[in-house]
Amino acid sequence: MATYEQVKDVPNHPDVYLIDVRRKEELQQTGFIPASINIPLDELDKALNLDGSAFKNKYGRSKPEKQSPIIFTCRSGNRVLEAEKIAKSQGYSNVVIYKGSWNEWAQKEGL
């Protein structure tokens, strides 16, 4: 499980993927954690099956390798559990969740 401090440090670790699985409308309402990429939960399974160039075109970042460090975040820490299952079922082995997710981030950042 990732902590607030680890998530805050993600911009200093370009090899880490911070994936926000909330819907785009939610991000427009609340904002997002810096360095995160948005892949809504209902797109995640398909997204992780895209080839590398299609993934980069759609999400603006190279596709994670199976061993790449991935941290999932959402609003309250529930959807990340499903995201973790999806990624692990596709062979991603270095996956953790940020249980505090947006709610904790916003509180600690004073947003």
Swiss-Prot record:
Quote the PROSITE patterns the UniProt record gives.
RHODANESE_3 (PS50206)
Which CDD domains would you find in this protein's record?
Answer: RHOD_HSP67B2
Give the domain of life. Answer: Eukaryota
Check the record and name the Pfam families matching this protein. Answer: Rhodanese (PF00581)
Instruction: Report the Gene3D superfamilies cross-referenced here.
Output: Rhodanese-like domain
User: Which PANTHER family does the record cross-reference, listed alphabetically?
Assistant: THIOSULFATE SULFURTRANSFERASE RDL2, MITOCHONDRIAL-RELATED, THIOSULFATE SULFURTRANSFERASE_RHODANESE-LIKE DOMAIN-CONTAINING PROTEIN 3
What is the protein name stated in its UniProt record? Answer: Rhodanese domain-containing protein CG4456
